[in-house]
């Protein structure tokens, strides 16, 4: 009996090693492109963005989920770094603070050129990986960080932003967040306001991916129905597996499928198991469910490392991605499906967003109605509190000019 137990144990170990080896072989040519990592936030909170401090050395930093050796061990070849500031910056210094976080990402690329290469388009991601670099891209987490300005949106694009999360844990004046669905916030726009729809259109024109993590279900549906390009959820999981309002319900997954969009699964325990503890296997359950409902082309990885506190057993840091891929292979995911999950689905969506951008040329020039803005910390040059009055004055001036011209002729 003992011999039989030993034999089956040995067989299980060999099978496990086989799946792990297969995972690593796949990842050597198709690396992880992760949708969301909050290391820049850690650089702020731990080191006040002083990257040259000896204790901030990313080759040795131990207290974060992410460092250079862990990225290498995890076969991470592309990373969307989150440029994030909390909601209490809204209507205050949000734009200044997000510029500082974007600067951190650029300085990471400058300080570690042998590891990080800042890129801004889909074709450069795999080229950077083939040069042995981690392609580094910028996602801005929270629509409050554009301060309801299309000009700021365009400027952040020129600084490298390639996705914008429409809300964080607060409404913007033009989009509702997920706390509305929980009953902890009031619906102000019932999804997207008219100005919010202009923001979406301008993102399509620029080639900025629309990120629907953190938004309300109504905002999800508005964006999926209105966007001319596929959208992403950069760090969200499946509501049917864990009914947390930050996750994506099945009816929205159907829209994800019909629009060729993408859900990049979050590893935070509360979104994985709806409790303080979770396992790698439960993360795989989310991936299985999204694949079943929306298709294998709709799944990606957005671990949310360094943005959360509790992570599943087996996925404690960014080095653990090969173990997750091995589990999916054990569950009979095909190599094609795995390569899609790792990188190819994201590259497809990113390329489609760029294609739409190439055919949209005219920028939006409307501004948000001034009454939608908190005016305590802002000026209003160029705005009008009563546009109808200005139109009447304009018409009057035109009439007077016509009258003066007529009198001159007399």
UniProtKB/Swiss-Prot annotation:
Keywords: Cell membrane, Cell projection, Dipeptidase, Disulfide bond, Glycoprotein, GPI-anchor, Hydrolase, Lipid metabolism, Lipoprotein, Membrane, Metal-binding, Metalloprotease, Protease, Signal, Zinc. Substrate binds at residues 168, 246, 304. It comes from the Eukaryota. GO terms for molecular function: beta-lactamase activity; dipeptidase activity; GPI anchor binding; identical protein binding; metallodipeptidase activity; modified amino acid binding; zinc ion binding. Residues 1-16 form the signal peptide. InterPro entries: Dipep_AS, Metal_Hydrolase, Pept_M19. Its EC number is 3.4.13.19, 3.5.2.6. It catalyses: an L-aminoacyl-L-amino acid + H2O = 2 an L-alpha-amino acid; leukotriene D4 + H2O = leukotriene E4 + glycine; L-cystine-bis-glycine + 2 H2O = L-cystine + 2 glycine; a beta-lactam + H2O = a substituted beta-amino acid. SUPFAM superfamilies: Metallo-dependent hydrolases. This is Dipeptidase 1. The lineage of its organism: Eukaryota, Metazoa, Chordata, Craniata, Vertebrata. The gene is Dpep1.
């Amino acid at each position: 009996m003992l011999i039989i137990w030993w034999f089956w144990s040995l067989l299980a170990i060999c099978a496990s090693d086989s799946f792990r080896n297969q995972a690593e072989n796949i990842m050597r040519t198709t690396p992880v492109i992760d949708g969301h990592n909050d290391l820049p936030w850690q650089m702020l909170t731990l080191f006040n963005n002083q990257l040259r401090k000896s204790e901030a050395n990313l080759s040795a930093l131990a207290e974060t989920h992410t460092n250079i050796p862990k990225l290498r061990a995890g076969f991470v070849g592309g990373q969307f770094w989150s440029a994030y500031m909390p909601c209490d910056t809204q209507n205050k210094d949000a734009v200044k603070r997000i510029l500082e976080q974007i600067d951190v990402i650029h300085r990471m690329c400058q300080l570690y050129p042998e590891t990080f290469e800042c890129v801004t388009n889909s074709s450069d991601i795999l080229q950077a990986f083939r040069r042995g670099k981690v392609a580094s891209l910028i996602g801005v987490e929270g629509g409050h960080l554009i301060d309801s300005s299309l000009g700021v949106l365009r400027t952040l694009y020129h600084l490298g932003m390639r996705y914008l999360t429409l809300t964080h844990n607060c409404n913007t004046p033009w989009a509702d967040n997920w706390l509305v669905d929980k009953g902890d916030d009031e619906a102000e726009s019932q999804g997207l306001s008219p100005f919010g729809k202009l923001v979406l259109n301008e993102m399509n024109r620029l080639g900025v991916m629309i990120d629907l993590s953190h938004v309300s279900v109504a905002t999800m549906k508005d964006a999926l129905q209105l966007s001319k390009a596929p959208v992403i959820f950069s760090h969200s999981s499946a509501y049917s597996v864990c009914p947390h309002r930050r996750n994506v319900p099945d009816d929205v997954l159907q829209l994800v499928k019909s629009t060729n969009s993408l859900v990049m699964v979050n590893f935070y325990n509360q979104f994985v198991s709806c409790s303080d503890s979770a396992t790698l296997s439960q993360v795989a359950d989310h991936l299985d469910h999204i694949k079943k409902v929306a298709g294998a082309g709709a799944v990606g990885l957005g671990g949310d490392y360094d943005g959360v506190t509790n992570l599943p057993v087996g996925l404690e840091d960014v080095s653990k991605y090969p173990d997750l891929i091995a589990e999916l292979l054990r569950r009979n995911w095909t190599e094609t499906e795995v390569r899609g999950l790792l990188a190819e689905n994201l590259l497809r969506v990113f390329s489609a967003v760029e294609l739409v951008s190439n055919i949209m040329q005219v920028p939006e020039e409307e501004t948000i109605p001034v009454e939608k803005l908190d005016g305590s910390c802002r000026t209003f040059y160029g705005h009008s509190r009563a546009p109808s009055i200005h139109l009447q004055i304009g018409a009057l001036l035109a009439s007077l000019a016509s009258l003066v011209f007529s009198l001159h002729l007399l």
